[in-house]
């Protein structure tokens, strides 16, 4: 890894993202002093970290890496208490104040009931939470975490990130961590460093980094689509007999009936009502069209990634006759129509979709209501 030149102010979270093997762990280990640097300097509060004594550095910097810790004959409380040893004397004897801090830290990570349990017998996720308690006990200025959410379920992933944000907000702690979950990185980070190959590819705020085209390039994403609105990825539709398709397939992508890629189902949706149907049809490999969807509708964002064609309308405009006619033509070529809207969800702006539903019923098409 070369040409890394970044600075991070106190009380901020920097997240490293990038493909596997890109160098995220190498950067964290270099900052922590666990890898000898070929060149360059790491400064902490204006001081070269190599000039700071080990015990003082342990008070100011806490590190949790991905390797599993397998200590012998240590309870969860013992592991958390390890964070207090930079503050003890040569014999490492904990004071009552130290023990109080250990109990508080275990309570924060919801592991106080496991204080006396053998660390090796608790689950990987619970071990990760105990290691976070150790970090809290250590009271550092800088926390380094390598994939801290790897072994956690979604509830405890969120809990861990909330704890980190609280430490940042209340104690002005600085956090540098690596994450694979882009949707979490987008929400928790103040700054993001993108690492790929030998270089730090880009550095900036989440708003600057999490762009559809850039994330696709960073991860060489050719088997799915990244949505900057949702902050998540969608699985690319299998090519199969229907061939390849790129996102943003508006009405111009619709083919004539009977040709490969022709939608078999027309979905009338809006306001998020079509999401589960879009994903179900994609899982089943059924090509479908969606419309009429306003370009600021959340269903439009998903449909443009999963549907074979989308009939759009401008944001905040009533569905016009041109969009209605295009949708009607495509719908008539489909053997099946799914309407995801309740009767009361039709209004002035999307009255064209009510007309589409009536035309489908009048024409005797196979109409299914999903509400």
Spans of features found by a protein language model:
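Conserved catalytic motifs of ABC-family nucleotide-binding domains
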Residues: 139
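ABC ATPase nucleotide-binding domains
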Residues: 220-318, 339, 347, 366-371
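Catalytic Walker B motif of ABC-type/P-loop ATPase nucleotide-binding domains
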Residues: 143-147
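Helix-to-loop junction immediately C-terminal to a conserved catalytic motif
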Residues: 32
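Conserved ABC ATPase "signature" region
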Residues: 81, 96-114
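Conserved ABC transporter NBD signature motif
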Residues: 40-48, 57
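Conserved switch/coupling elements of ABC/ABC-like ATPase nucleotide-binding domains
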Residues: 48, 193, 197-208
């Amino acid at each position: 890894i070369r040409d890394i030149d970044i600075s991070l102010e106190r009380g901020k979270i920097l997240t490293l993202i990038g493909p596997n093997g890109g160098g995220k762990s190498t950067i964290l280990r270099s900052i922590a002093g666990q890898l000898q640097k070929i060149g360059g300097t790491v400064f902490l509060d204006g001081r070269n970290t190599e000039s700071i004594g080990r015990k003082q550095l342990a008070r100011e910097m806490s590190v949790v890496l991905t390797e599993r810790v397998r200590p012998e004959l240590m309870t969860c409380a013992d592991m958390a208490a390890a964070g207090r040893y930079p503050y003890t004397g040569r014999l490492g004897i904990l004071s009552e104040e130290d023990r109080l801090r250990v109990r508080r830290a275990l309570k924060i990570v919801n592991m106080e009931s496991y204080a006396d349990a053998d660390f090796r017998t608790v689950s990987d996720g619970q071990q990760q939470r105990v290691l976070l308690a150790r970090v809290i006990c250590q009271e550092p200025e800088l926390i380094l975490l390598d994939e801290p959410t790897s072994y956690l379920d979604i509830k405890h992933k969120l809990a861990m990130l909330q704890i980190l944000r609280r430490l940042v907000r209340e104690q002005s702690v600085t956090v540098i961590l690596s994450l694979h979950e882009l949707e979490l990185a987008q929400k928790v980070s103040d700054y993001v460093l993108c690492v790929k190959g030998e270089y730090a590819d880009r550095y900036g705020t989440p708003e600057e980094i999490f762009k559809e085209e850039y994330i696709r390039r960073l991860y060489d994403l050719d088997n799915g689509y990244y949505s900057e609105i949702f902050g998540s990825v969608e699985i690319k539709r299998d090519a199969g007999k229907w061939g390849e398709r790129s996102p943003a397939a508006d009405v111009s992508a619709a083919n004539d009936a009977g040709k490969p890629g022709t939608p078999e189902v027309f979905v009338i949706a809006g306001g998020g009502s079509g999401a589960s149907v879009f994903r179900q049809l994609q899982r089943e490999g059924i090509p479908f069209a969606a419309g009429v969807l306003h370009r600021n509708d959340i269903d439009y964002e998903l449909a443009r990634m999963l549907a074979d064609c989308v009939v759009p309308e401008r944001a905040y405009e009533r569905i016009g006759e041109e969009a209605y006619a295009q949708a009607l033509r495509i719908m008539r070529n489909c053997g099946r129509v799914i309407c995801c809207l309740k009767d009361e969800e039709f209004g002035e702006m999307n009255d064209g979709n009510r007309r589409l539903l009536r035309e489908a019923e009048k024409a005797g098409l196979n109409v299914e209501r999903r509400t």
